[in-house]
Structure formats: C-alpha cells, structure tokens
Amino acid sequence: MAAGGPGTEPAAPVSSTSSLPLAALNMRVRRRLSLFLNVRTQVAADWTALAEEMDFEYLEIRQLETHADPTGRLLDAWQGRPGASVGRLLELLTKLGRDDVLLELGPSIEEDCQKYILKQQQEEAEKPLQVAAVDSSVPRTAELAGITTLDDPLGHMPERFDAFICYCPSDIQFVQEMIRQLEQTNYRLKLCVSDRDVLPGTCVWSIASELIEKRCRRMVVVVSDDYLQSKECDFQTKFALSLSPGAHQKRLIPIKYKAMKKEFPSILRFITVCDYTNPCTKSWFWTRLAKALSLP
C-alpha cells in the first residue's frame, strides 16, 4: 500500500467536505483508512506522521501505539479537537503524499458525506415549527454540552457510548481489563469510563444522569464489596433501573468479578449476572458480555 508514484494521477478533491465533522465518516471508511495507515513502511507516511500533522504530542502518540487499531483511535481522539473536519483530513493526507489513499477511498468518503448532508437536511425538514419538548439527543443545559473528552463543545454532536461503566475506584484494574477486552479487540465497543472520558468541573450527579439516560445504550455495574458502600454507584444504579422498570430493555448488566464477603445487592438479584468468578463459564465471559452490549 505505497503512496502514488510519479505516474499516478493526483487524487480528485472530494466536494462538500471542508466543514463537515469527522463523524460524517462511517465505520467502513475508517476501517479502510486503518488498513492503509496502520502499516509501518519506509516508503509511505503512516498514522504516526498523520498524528504529528494533527498536532498530537510525542507521549500522546506513544499512548496510541498501545492500541490494536491506532488509526481508529487517532481519528476518535482528533475529531473532538478544534479544526477537525473531513476536509482537513483530506488536506493532511494530500500533504503527506498519500494520494493512493485518496484515490482508493475518495468515492466512499464522498458517499458518506452526501449521506450525512442528506440526513442533516431531512432532520431539519422534520423539525416541528414549535418544539414541544427538548430533543433527547441534545444536552438539556449548556452545562452538559461539553462533558466528555470527545464532546462537541457546542452540544451539536454529543459523544455517545455503547455502555456506561458504574464502578468504584478500587475496581479500576478490572475496568481497565474490560477496556482491553471490549474496546481494543474485534468487538470495537465504546465504553464510558468516568475517570478516562468525563471532563472535570461539572456536578457528578448531573453528568451521570445525562450519560446514562441520553448518551449510553447500556450500563454495566461492577459489583464488589466497595460498590455497596458507594453513594455514587448507588445513585447510578437506581437511576438506570428507573429508566427500565423490570429490566424489560436489558439496560443494566451486573458483573461480579471477584468473591464478595457481603451479600449481593437485592436490587440487582432479579437481573441475570455476568459472573467472572465462575471457572466453568469464565472462558465465555467476554463473548457473552460483548454480545449483550451489542444488542440493539
């Protein structure tokens, strides 16, 4: 996958992309970009060169190197920064001499952009003349417009996740293992981990409510003895249960990852538990959890 040689025609510019957010690019294009840029070669600029052009610092690039798909993580991180757009991405690829990428992916990028524009136009046309209720996809107050690391500061494109992780600080090592197993593998799930994804400075109760109700499709509860003592975890769990009485929407998934001295919380006993402590089912644990989080 080398860059275009002297006989290669320059890549045609993709129209209508200069100001579109990177969210316009679907997973198919992102995966194909990764196929081109994840490969380290001596003859073509790879994802590290792109990261430098995007003004990522050395330590940030070293951190991205730990991921199975560094290009994908780079795009996710960059799209929350000022000036990030589809048009800017194409400019940087051109600057790096990756006309081969543009020639190969140009039509797909154009198609994604046109779909994005059409969707925006349709949503605009479907808006009522007088809005009777607040759109659930938009943060309810300005305070909640920029609460995660990849949020749109204006609140137009709030960051969304597959699952909110409810946990105690003492259980962070298991949460980190969850990140490795579910985000950095072929499951490619997106988890909301407060210590990693939430910006400081906003009321923790407001943030939790916004993320659990509006931004995350599921909530994983890491149950432990320390969890039972946490007021924050208690609030998050009860709030999630209130959104889906009787667990009809399979919104909440409890996890028991180590032996407990105290009784399992009665509020969660009626929900099927993902038990990491059972040696007979441990080999199926991550597959079961990933499939549960991937349900529509």
Swiss-Prot record:
Annotated region (Intermediate domain), positions in chain: 110-155
InterPro entries linked to this entry: DEATH-like_dom_sf, Death_dom, MyD88_Death, Myelin_different_resp_MyD88, TIR_dom, Toll_tir_struct_dom_sf
Residues recorded as bearing Phosphoserine in the entry: 244
SMART domains: DEATH, TIR
Gene3D superfamilies in the record: Death Domain, Fas (1.10.533.10), Toll/interleukin-1 receptor homology (TIR) domain (3.40.50.10140)
Pfam families assigned: Death, TIR_2
Domain (Death) ranges: 32-109
Post-translational modification: Ubiquitinated; undergoes 'Lys-63'-linked polyubiquitination. OTUD4 specifically hydrolyzes 'Lys-63'-linked polyubiquitinated MYD88. Deubiquitinated by USP3 that cleaves 'Lys-63'-linked ubiquitin chains leading to inhibition of MYD88-induced NF-kappa-B signaling.
Disulfide bonds: none
GO aspect biological process, one term: Toll signaling pathway
Compartment(s): Cytoplasm; Nucleus
Residue ranges of every copy of the TIR domain listed in the record: 159-293
Main location class: cytoplasm
RNA-binding listed as a keyword: no
Free-text comment about domains: The intermediate domain (ID) is required for the phosphorylation and activation of IRAK.
Subunit structure: Homodimer. Also forms heterodimers with TIRAP. Binds to TLR2, TLR4, IRAK1, IRAK2 and IRAK4 via their respective TIR domains. Interacts with IL18R1. Interacts with BMX, IL1RL1, IKBKE and IRF7. Interacts with LRRFIP1 and LRRFIP2; this interaction positively regulates Toll-like receptor (TLR) signaling in response to agonist. Interacts with FLII. LRRFIP1 and LRRFIP2 compete with FLII for MYD88-binding. Interacts with IRF1. Upon IL1B treatment, forms a complex with PELI1, IRAK1, IRAK4 and TRAF6; this complex recruits MAP3K7/TAK1, TAB1 and TAB2 to mediate NF-kappa-B activation.
Matching PANTHER family: MYD88, MYELOID DIFFERENTIATION PRIMARY RESPONSE PROTEIN MYD88
Function of the protein: Adapter protein involved in the Toll-like receptor and IL-1 receptor signaling pathway in the innate immune response. Acts via IRAK1, IRAK2, IRF7 and TRAF6, leading to NF-kappa-B activation, cytokine secretion and the inflammatory response. Increases IL-8 transcription. Involved in IL-18-mediated signaling pathway. Activates IRF1 resulting in its rapid migration into the nucleus to mediate an efficient induction of IFN-beta, NOS2/INOS, and IL12A genes.
Record-given protein name: Myeloid differentiation primary response protein MyD88
